Amino acid sequence: KFLIQDFIPGDDNYMHILTCYVDQDSKVRFMSFGHTILEDHGDAAIGNPVAIINQVDREVMDKSIRFLEETGYTGFANFDIKYDERDGKYRYFEINTRLGRSNFYITGSGFNAVKWIVDDLIYHKEFDDEIVIADNENLYTVVPKSIVLAYCGTPELKEQVQRLYREGKVSNPIDYKGERNIIHKLYVKYFMH
């Protein structure tokens, strides 16, 4: 069997990520939407985002809520989505039933993705009816600033990235301030800045 898929034009800047948590009653409780700036192009991790900016897109989120709740889905859902400039619509490529490799983009925006599954399955907490949306603008990256800036597809995106750096709204899980290993600290200092 083969799956034939339309080629959606555009580089990494057209990619987006949506991470959701759906409780055991199939109600979406948490959502985080991100605009991918750059993906990994190495053989071992191809396609994994290495730079993401949190955003909110209610249309994408509402469609995803309907899909997840109407299908009886539970657990984490991590969507790979690409914007199609030909018609201005988003195309869903896949859904992963786990947190993505780059889920620190959620943490960097001030939210704890794991909290939802723990509260749901371990503590059996009652959730508010309102869906929590990770709406704090933040740049997640695991590559040097110069690389992120080099791959911004538009002047507007480049300015947004520069502004986030100026405002200190950048999260990099490799650049951990509490790190005590001198080799790791030197690596971060010389290769990540």
What is each stretch, according to the model?
Residues 1, 71-74:
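Short secondary-structure junctions
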Residues 5-6, 74-86:
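A short glycine-rich, hydrophobically flanked beta-strand micro-motif that places a catalytic Asp/Glu
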Residues 30, 91-92, 128:
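A sequence-level detector of short linear motifs
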Residues 88-98:
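A short beta-strand motif that forms the metal-chelation/ATP-contact edge
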